[in-house]
Amino acid sequence: MALLSKSFKQEYSLEKRKLISSKIRNRYKDRLPIIVERAANSDVPDINKKKFLAPSNMVITNFIMEIRKHLDDSDHNEQKAIFLFVNKNNLPPSSQLLSSIYDAHKDEDGFLYICYSGENTFGSDI
């Protein structure tokens, strides 16, 4: 039985999260601090890393490819689509820059929170 992991916000206080994001933004001016967590009812495998430091000029499609590299299931890449949601219910266009998403949706702590989910787009296994 797998243990449920704490969300990043549950794990760290607001003050600690602000401090972490501020240090990141000061050190890496062209990078965005992003927290990626699996949607609660998703059938997509868990991710082996939550914190990402993404280039501000990266588009959402490229960020999805980066997330795929960190899924705990190697078969997932070929069988399922991944959908990213900002603020739990906003699905950004695939060509949108992470910088514009960050500017519009960053949390008060300085991180952009993205959750991912998926669905099987190729039917059942043969």
UniProtKB/Swiss-Prot annotation:
One of its GO terms (biological process) is autophagosome assembly. It is a lipid-anchor. One of its GO terms (molecular function) is phosphatidylethanolamine binding. It is found in: Membrane. Keywords: Lipoprotein, Membrane. GO terms for cellular component: autophagosome; autophagosome membrane. It comes from Dictyostelium discoideum (Social amoeba). The lineage of its organism: Eukaryota, Amoebozoa, Evosea, Eumycetozoa, Dictyostelia. InterPro entries: Atg8-like (IPR004241), Ubiquitin-like_domsf (IPR029071). This is Autophagy-related protein 8-like protein DDB_G0290491. The keyword Repeat does not apply. Residues 124-126 form a propeptide. It comes from the Eukaryota. A lipid is attached at G123 (Phosphatidylethanolamine amidated glycine). The keyword Ligase does not apply. Belongs to the ATG8 family. Its main location: membrane.
